[in-house]
Amino acid sequence: MQIIEGKLQLQGNEKIAILTSRFNHIITDRLKEGAMDCFKRHGGDEELLDLVLVPGAYELPLILDKLLESGKYDGVCVLGAIIRGGTPHFDYVSAEATKGIASAMLKYSMPVSFGVLTTDNIEQAIERAGSKAGNKGFEAMSTLIELLSLCQTLKD
């Protein structure tokens, strides 16, 4: 039996985009910082890293689709923060963002990591953006790095 898995190390020539929503920027800024830290720690070249900002999580799928369609990127790390409020808006935005991101990834068969927080309150979001529960932006970039490696291994 052969075990095939990705490595947590960039080759240094991968072109990566971090796609981040600005809404709830207190959280998404920390996620973005975590993703950038992970990228640097694992051999990424900052000259090959683009940061793309959109107004909110609902806009992430459209711009992800455009980034993947461009053919300029080897992978995209998608970050956002959707925090439940008093209306059904949370349910609609989180469902459509999630479906749209997955759809774009499968449409282009490209590595995409999902670092969009969906939390019940601001405290949970803060915990996942660098406090008690680690930094989900860092984790999303780690996932992308492994996916890039695994896809390359499967291609060879």
From Swiss-Prot:
Q: Which cysteines are joined by disulfide bonds?
A: none
Annotated CDD domains: Lumazine_synthase-I
Q: Which GO terms describe its molecular function?
A: 6,7-dimethyl-8-ribityllumazine synthase activity
The UniProt record lists the keyword Transferase:
yes
Its GO CC terms? Answer: cytosol; riboflavin synthase complex
**PANTHER family the record matches:** 6,7-DIMETHYL-8-RIBITYLLUMAZINE SYNTHASE, 6,7-DIMETHYL-8-RIBITYLLUMAZINE SYNTHASE DMRL SYNTHASE LUMAZINE SYNTHASE
Q: What is this protein called?
A: 6,7-dimethyl-8-ribityllumazine synthase
Give the species.
Answer: Helicobacter pylori (strain J99 / ATCC 700824)
